[in-house]
Amino acid sequence: MTIFTERLKELRLKKGLTQKDIADLVHVNRVTYTNWEKGKREPSFENLIKLADLLEVSLDWLFGRE
């Protein structure tokens, strides 16, 4: 796992959201989101921004730069 995938899961759980909840809010299917969280695929820049906004963190924090 990478810092990104660990933090993505950590924030999702902290906010009490399911993988499907986040997928719906970002407008992707659950399998796509699950692949991001498992590190099998990487979200587009547009979806990274959506995730950061939704989870109320910076992209720098999501990637361990902060």
What are these regions (language model features)?
Residues 17-35:
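Short alpha-helical DNA-recognition segment
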Residues 37, 55, 63-66:
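DNA major-groove recognition helix of helix-turn-helix
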Residues 27, 46-61:
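DNA major-groove recognition helix of helix-turn-helix/homeodomain DNA-binding modules
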Residues 13, 24, 53:
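Alpha-helical residues within the helix-turn-helix
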Residues 1-14:
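A short, Lys/Arg-rich alpha-helix, primarily the initiator
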Residues 7, 18, 44-47, 58:
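Residues that mark the N-terminal boundary/hinge immediately upstream of a DNA-recognition element
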